[in-house]
Amino acid sequence: FNSVAHTSDNSSVEINYIKMAIANSILIKRHMKNNQVCLVTDSNGKKYLEKQDKLYHFDHVVVQDKQYKGKGPNDNLVVNTRAMRNGTDTIRLPWQNQSRPDAYKLSPYDKTILLDSDYFVFDDILDKLFDTDYNVLCGAHVGEVSQQGTLIDYKRLHHQTIKMYWATVLYFTKSYEAELLFKIMNSVKTNWQYYGKLYKFASKTYRNDFALSIAIHMLRAKQEVFKTYELPFKIMCVADKNIMTSNNAFVFRKGDTWAGSSFPTQNVHVMNKQSAMEISERVCNG
């Protein structure tokens, strides 16, 4: 839940996903009416919450320690790592993302919205999902607020294969359909190398977005027009090339100069982890 990376000038960057989750819980309870929050973390994460006296921010805390079975996705089957930009620097961070396919059995709720801890909730649009008749909804469209479309990695897993869906925001109910989705995701995770060859992606690092995309493809009877599982809005993100200067403003390097802008306050996935930490500090400190 906590890691330290070093930038090109040898300064350190502490990334604490528990602190991001605390900030998000505060925001969810501030902006949403459906605001029960369950945190899934490992034993160290819960110990941190207890030591900091921060358990009260969550209605439930579910402990799941790292586990992995199957071939791939990495030489190290416990810790994924991923290179991420931090403005003009590149850092490599541990990437603990392999418990997401277990969310169906871990959730204590009949209706759940599964969020990345760095997807910050600044409005109530997610409340609308609880009023739908769908059993599964996820991100099909992503918008990058700086309008640098090349910063978004994929529209398809491979140009010859299937449409990309994003696991950043995933709504599901306790239903046969949702349970099947997560079973397929677990199968993809366990057999990562096989599915990589089948769907022509080269990622050695396990990605929930890819596993979700394959599961949606199968639920749709392998047809892109058979049934929709798409959220009724874009997932807005700020790419890691951008540095957030407030909750709704950013700057980025353009040639030899810096440029930037602000945007309407809204839910946003902050991919620059140092910026996500700074937002978390602002929220937690009032």
Model regions and ranges:
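Short, polar loop motifs at secondary-structure junctions
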Residues: 41-47, 66-67, 120-124
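Conserved catalytic core of nucleotide-sugar-dependent glycosyltransferases
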Residues: 127-191
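Short, acidic, metal-binding catalytic loop of nucleotide-sugar glycosyltransferases
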Residues: 27-34
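A residue-level signal for conserved active-site and pocket-lining positions in enzyme catalytic cores
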Residues: 28, 104, 118, 170, ...
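Active-site-proximal specificity loops/subdomain of glycosyltransferases
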Residues: 46-107
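Residues at the starts of beta-strands that form the adenosine-phosphate
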Residues: 36-37, 111
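A glycosyltransferase accessory/donor-loop signature
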Residues: 1-6, 11-13, 17-23, 39, ...
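GT-A fold catalytic core of metal-dependent nucleotide-sugar glycosyltransferases
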Residues: 96-148
